[in-house]
């Protein structure tokens, strides 16, 4: 396949080094797309703690680091999009940054990718409005995972993600208060169910790890 074919991969973390289960999957996913299928691979990713862009493997042709939203932006996103308007789950609101979208817009203009992939539900909001062939790689349905955990033991659920650790201890305790957390999780499940179906309809393809996730 000619290297003129391009894929833009939008990710919530770097796909390297292959030090965890998801990173290992992403690493080989990218390697196969580049080395075996011959695509020029452009990656736009946020950084997680410990990520080092200097370790970029050769099969990634271009890497752009996306700026995470500030705490103020996250709070605004949650209040307006998840609580008041109820149009986005917190999984999406916590990763939405207009500055990151501008970078992705520039990448699309410069590279004109044939395919754009959004990794996990938190990245798919960035790819929904392009003319390229769009793939939502959701891995699993978080709404189902949360529902199973809610039915079994809510103590294992943190709907706020790493954002919780950026807040004062007193606020953390309030947000983890069981009645409040049950309400938040139930609302998040409802928003995720709607969003997962909506993004699946808007993208050209949707990928799940297990067939039963797609069947439900």
Walk through the language-model features, giving the residues of each.
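Extended catalytic core of nucleotide-activated donor transferases of GT-like folds
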Residues: 11-13, 25-28, 51, 65-74, ...
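Helix-loop-beta element that forms the nucleotide-linked donor phosphate-binding surface
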Residues: 130-131, 201-202, 207-209, 214-216
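Active-site proximal beta-strand in glycosyltransferases
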Residues: 7, 130-175
């Amino acid at each position: 396949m000619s290297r003129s074919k391009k894929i833009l991969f939008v990710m919530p973390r770097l796909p390297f080094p292959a030090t965890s289960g998801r990173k290992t999957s992403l690493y080989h996913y990218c390697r196969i797309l580049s080395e075996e299928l011959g695509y020029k691979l452009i990656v736009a990713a946020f950084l997680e703690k410990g990520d080092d862009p200097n370790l970029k493997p050769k099969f990634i042709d271009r890497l752009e680091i996306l700026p995470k939203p500030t705490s103020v932006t996250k709070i605004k996103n949650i209040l307006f999009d998840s609580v008041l308007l109820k149009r986005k789950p917190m999984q999406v609101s916590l990763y939405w940054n207009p500055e990151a979208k501008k970078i992705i817009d520039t990448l699309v203009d410069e590279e004109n990718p044939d395919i754009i992939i959004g990794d996990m539900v938190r990245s798919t909001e960035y790819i929904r409005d392009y003319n390229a062939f769009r793939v939502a790689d959701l891995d699993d349905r978080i709404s189902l995972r949360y529902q199973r955990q809610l039915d079994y033991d809510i103590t294992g659920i943190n709907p706020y993600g790493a954002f919780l650790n950026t807040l004062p201890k007193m606020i953390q305790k309030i947000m983890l208060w069981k009645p409040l957390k049950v309400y938040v999780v139930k609302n998040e499940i409802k928003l995720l169910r709607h969003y997962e179906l909506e993004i699946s309809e808007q993208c050209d393809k949707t990928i799940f790890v297990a067939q039963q996730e797609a069947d439900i």
